[in-house]
Amino acid sequence: MPTYETDGQISVSLEFEIGSVWIRATKRTDTVVEVRPTSAAKDADVKAAELTQVDFSGGRLTVKGPKQRTVFSSKKGSIDLTVELPAGSEVHADSPMADFVTEGPLGDCRIKTSMGRIQVDRAVGARLKTDMGDIRLGTVSGDAEVTGSGRIEVGAVGGRLTVKNSNGDTEIDEVHGVLTANASNGRIHIGLAEGDVEAKTANGHIRVGQVVRGKVGLQSGVGDIEVGIAEGTAAWLDVHSKFGAVRNALDTAAGPGEARETVEVRGATQVGSILIRRA
């Protein structure tokens, strides 16, 4: 189990083909790495763990697994990797088939896998991508980009958030910057949006619990649209449904009057109802 003295934040690079990763970031002065075979009874897993290289130099930790001819085979080795490191460290990881879980505050976090789930607790910035699997992102103080095919859950993002989901529901708690969310098949639910919003889905409902200001564009092929307008915000509306009811529960006015904020809402659905209400 390699242990390195690390007085401050470090950068981490992980490259391997099959397995799982657990990263724990805390206030500490060392970094501990453990590489284990996923199954100690499987020769391929044991060999993959033995051939995995771990190196630390110049504040950079590198973990590199052995190259395997093909990933999608029961004969290929799988490793379980655990890294305990200082809070605020950067993590960049790339694996064709792996699950990732992080706990504690990280710096910039970039994780990419073709097949596997990704769960990130906290980060300064995040870029997460899986071609097949769920993604859960907790809190990001800066910008975040999430691309997946499965269920996507995002907590709070302080900056810009971009989400692309090819098949699955998308749940976003709150975004304080610009939000762009696109889904081929699945619902998009947004709790609080304090900036511009652009959300599109070919099949699914779109719900925004509360918008405060800016421009909001919502589009669904088949699905309902619901938007809550914050108290003290005046709204300009341009909403249409080809086959469905449109209901505006706001009080009408000739202009914004003494409203503290203004929002422009454009919404369209081919099949579904639209509701605009106070949040």
Name each model feature, range by range.
Residues 1-279:
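Intrinsically disordered, low-complexity terminal regions
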